């Protein structure tokens, strides 16, 4: 089977964060998160675990710090990218503004022929739960 080409867009948020031992403090480390996300996915049982991932780090923030300018940066990236090259898009995003971003992208990406998923987490990546 041909490897599925998947676009992974990292924007920060808890899903791209690492916490202290008590998970009281977290620090967004999107570049470090990229390696761990891909490693964990490749070790999973997913049929796409050997997919061909293009990873783009668009933002490196907690989502409560999202602004119109940052949404525009994400939209501009998606509009200039040839999404027809991919089998799907995964956007890792924080939970605080996920609903707003998903609503915005449903309008911006209407008519897109491939699935676009937004994923988030309530716990940092290094939390064993």
Locate each region found by the language model:
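Active-site histidine-anchored catalytic micro-motif
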Residues: 1-129
């Amino acid at each position: 089977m041909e490897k599925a080409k998947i676009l992974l867009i990292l924007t920060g948020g808890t899903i791209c964060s690492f916490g202290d031992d008590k998970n009281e403090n977290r620090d967004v480390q999107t570049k470090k998160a990229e390696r761990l996300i891909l490693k964990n996915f490749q070790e999973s049982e997913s049929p796409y675990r050997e997919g061909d991932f293009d990873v783009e780090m668009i933002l490196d923030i907690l989502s409560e710090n999202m602004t119109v300018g940052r949404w525009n940066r994400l939209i501009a990236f998606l509009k200039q990218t040839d999404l027809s090259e991919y089998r799907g898009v995964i956007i890792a995003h924080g939970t605080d503004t996920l609903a707003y971003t998903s609503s915005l992208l449903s309008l911006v990406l209407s008519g897109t022929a491939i699935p676009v998923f937004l994923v988030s987490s309530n716990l940092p990546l290094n939390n064993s739960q």
